[in-house]
């Protein structure tokens, strides 16, 4: 099929605003945020009246910060080479504000600086605050934004707006998530809070609802009558790198499963919303979260990688990583089975797995359909045609796309049947570069669209599900490490499926 060279209606341009990044010297700013801002500028999405201010503790001049961000764009943007004209149009609107997150003077001077930016650059008083800091600072920053009148409490259609983006984790359990929400409620407006899960900004994830609800082919069989089980897998070849301090406080369940994987599960299983709006989609996602049955201890496997070889390179075990306790009991792999107690999904097992130091980097969803109920292809009538399950594979990364596997007769044979695949890939079908997740999410926030952001109700419902499991884990000492770096997974994760007569899909 020919490439599609003409795209549909373009996304709207963003209104003027000033974006303040707290923790602007961190990896997220360099690897994700500024490459996204550069690409949005290149595509004409950002207003010429957009300004970005980095807020961090390290002493740094405007010029130093700009040069560091230019290097970051060069290193991490999906654009092949930096376009000097695009960079120059953005560069003079980038500033650095050196201050401590806990000191009042830093916020007072920030307020004065933003007022001068409004006057000079025409940002119209619109403000986007981005918390790209460790979660320990969230509440302190939120309180200071309110205390120093940096956040507007009354926001109407004709008034300037202020919005807050929070990066996960949104607490480390139900209690801390509730404490964070109490701080938000006491200081700012919940409708102005955008909890970012970058998985929701990925094109294939956004496409899940379209695949389901715009195609009778899929939605008509999207239920327990036709689906045998579902697998959602996140495999990472990397270890924890320099994130030892963070990962020791989180682990894989908190870092990946409680948020990213649960969002994928909700989109995959929710009922059709009454309308395609942020509020209605969130309503259906919350219904799903509340219908997930309590997770049994025997249906969860946790693991931690030991030393091994990944893609031909010898690597250390988790306990030998930088800033990691040499006796750490933190999990780097989780597999679990859960059930949704509603008419559509009753009895269908959902298997989720996420792990580090696995053979390769991939994230996908596999919908495994039941085998045909017709008796035409049984072993007596057709000894050479054992049927495979039909599969729908939604690839989220890399090679974003969708593949459908089904059974077909082999040409030139009598009754030989083999599985074949139809494969759609974004990069080969659409003549365009798939936008990075942060490009879409930053624009949506500036435009005031909360559809792809996580609500407080979703966060709390997810923690209600996983906090009891974390409590159980705290009382049991696992035997770690229990899988070799570069292997597929711990043995117990294979047994989780094999005792049900199933197996993880190979990749």
Swiss-Prot record:
<dbReference type="InterPro" id="IPR022674">
    <property type="entry name" value="G6P_DH_NAD-bd"/>
</dbReference>
<dbReference type="InterPro" id="IPR019796">
    <property type="entry name" value="G6P_DH_AS"/>
</dbReference>
<dbReference type="GO" id="GO:0006006">
    <property type="term" value="P:glucose metabolic process"/>
</dbReference>
<feature type="binding site">
    <location>
        <position position="356"/>
    </location>
    <ligand>
        <name>substrate</name>
    </ligand>
</feature>
<dbReference type="InterPro" id="IPR036291">
    <property type="entry name" value="NAD(P)-bd_dom_sf"/>
</dbReference>
<keyword id="KW-0560">Oxidoreductase</keyword>
<feature type="binding site">
    <location>
        <position position="202"/>
    </location>
    <ligand>
        <name>substrate</name>
    </ligand>
</feature>
<keyword id="KW-0521">NADP</keyword>
<feature type="binding site">
    <location>
        <position position="255"/>
    </location>
    <ligand>
        <name>substrate</name>
    </ligand>
</feature>
<comment type="similarity">
    <text>Belongs to the glucose-6-phosphate dehydrogenase family.</text>
</comment>
<comment type="function">
    <text>Catalyzes the oxidation of glucose 6-phosphate to 6-phosphogluconolactone.</text>
</comment>
<feature type="binding site">
    <location>
        <position position="236"/>
    </location>
    <ligand>
        <name>substrate</name>
    </ligand>
</feature>
<dbReference type="Pfam" id="PF00479">
    <property type="entry name" value="G6PD_N"/>
</dbReference>
<dbReference type="GO" id="GO:0004345">
    <property type="term" value="F:glucose-6-phosphate dehydrogenase activity"/>
</dbReference>
<protein>
    <recommendedName>
        <fullName>Glucose-6-phosphate 1-dehydrogenase</fullName>
        <ecNumber>1.1.1.49</ecNumber>
    </recommendedName>
</protein>
<feature type="binding site">
    <location>
        <position position="168"/>
    </location>
    <ligand>
        <name>NADP(+)</name>
    </ligand>
</feature>
<feature type="binding site">
    <location>
        <position position="198"/>
    </location>
    <ligand>
        <name>substrate</name>
    </ligand>
</feature>
<keyword id="KW-0119">Carbohydrate metabolism</keyword>
<dbReference type="GO" id="GO:0050661">
    <property type="term" value="F:NADP binding"/>
</dbReference>
<dbReference type="GO" id="GO:0009051">
    <property type="term" value="P:pentose-phosphate shunt, oxidative branch"/>
</dbReference>
<keyword id="KW-0313">Glucose metabolism</keyword>
<dbReference type="GO" id="GO:0005829">
    <property type="term" value="C:cytosol"/>
</dbReference>
<dbReference type="Pfam" id="PF02781">
    <property type="entry name" value="G6PD_C"/>
</dbReference>
<comment type="pathway">
    <text>Carbohydrate degradation; pentose phosphate pathway; D-ribulose 5-phosphate from D-glucose 6-phosphate (oxidative stage): step 1/3.</text>
</comment>
<dbReference type="InterPro" id="IPR022675">
    <property type="entry name" value="G6P_DH_C"/>
</dbReference>
<feature type="active site" description="Proton acceptor">
    <location>
        <position position="260"/>
    </location>
</feature>
<dbReference type="InterPro" id="IPR001282">
    <property type="entry name" value="G6P_DH"/>
</dbReference>
<feature type="binding site">
    <location>
        <position position="57"/>
    </location>
    <ligand>
        <name>NADP(+)</name>
    </ligand>
</feature>
């Amino acid at each position: 099929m020919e490439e599609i060279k003409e795209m549909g209606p373009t996304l709207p341009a963003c209104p003027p605003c000033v974006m303040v990044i707290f923790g602007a010297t961190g990896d997220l700013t360099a690897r994700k945020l500024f490459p996204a801002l550069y690409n949005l500028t290149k595509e004409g999405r950002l207003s010429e009246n957009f300004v970005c201010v980095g807020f961090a503790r390290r002493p740094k001049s405007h010029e130093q910060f700009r040069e560091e961000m230019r290097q970051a764009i060069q290193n991490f943007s999906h654009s092949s080479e930096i376009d000097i004209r695009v960079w120059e149009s953005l560069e003079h609107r980038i500033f650095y504000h050196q201050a401590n997150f806990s000191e009042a003077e830093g916020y007072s001077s920030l307020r004065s600086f933003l007022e001068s930016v409004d006057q000079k650059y025409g940002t119209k008083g619109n403000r986007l605050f981005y918390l790209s800091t460790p979660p320990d600072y969230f509440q302190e920053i939120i309180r200071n934004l309110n205390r120093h009148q940096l956040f507007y409490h009354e926001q109407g259609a004709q008034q300037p707006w202020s919005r807050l983006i929070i990066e996960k984790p949104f607490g480390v359990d139900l209690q801390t998530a509730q404490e964070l929400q109490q701080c938000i409620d006491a200081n700012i407006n919940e409708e102005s809070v955008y909890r970012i899960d970058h998985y929701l900004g990925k094109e294939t994830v956004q496409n899940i609802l379209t695949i389901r609800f715009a195609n009778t082919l899929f939605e008509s069989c999207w239920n327990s009558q036709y689906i045998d089980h579902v697998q959602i897998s996140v495999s990472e070849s990397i270890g924890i790198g320099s994130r030892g301090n963070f990962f020791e406080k989180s682990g894989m369940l908190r870092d990946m499963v409680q948020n990213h994987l649960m969002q994928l599960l909700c989109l995959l299983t929710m009922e059709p919303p009454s309308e395609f709006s942020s509020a209605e989609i969130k309503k259906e996602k919350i219904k799903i979260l509340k219908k997930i049955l309590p997770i049994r201890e025997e249906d969860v496997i946790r693991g931690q990688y030991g030393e091994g070889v990944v893609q031909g390179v010898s690597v250390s075990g988790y306990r030998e990583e930088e800033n990691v306790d040499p006796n750490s009991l933190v999990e780097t792999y989780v597999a679990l089975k859960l059930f949704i107690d509603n008419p559509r999904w009753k009895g269908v097992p959902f298997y989720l797995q996420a792990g580090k130091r696995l053979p390769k980097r991939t994230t996908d969803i596999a919908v495994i359909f039941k085998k045909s109920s017709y008796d035409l292809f049984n072993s007596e009538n057709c000894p050479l045609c054992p049927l495979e399950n039909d599969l729908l594979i939604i690839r989220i990364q890399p090679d974003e796309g969708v593949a459908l596997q089904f059974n077909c007769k082999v040409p030139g044979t009598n009754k030989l049947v083999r599985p074949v695949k139809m494969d759609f890939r974004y990069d080969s079908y659409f003549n365009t570069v798939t936008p990075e997740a942060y490009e879409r999410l930053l624009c949506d926030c500036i435009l005031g669209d909360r559809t792809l952001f996580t609500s407080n109700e979703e966060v709390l419902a997810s923690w209600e599900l996983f906090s009891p499991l974390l409590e159980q884990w705290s009382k049991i000492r696992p035997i770690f490490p229990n899988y070799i770096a570069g292997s597929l997974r711990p043995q117990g994760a294979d047994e989780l499926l094999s005792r049900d007569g199933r197996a993880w899909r190979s990749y």
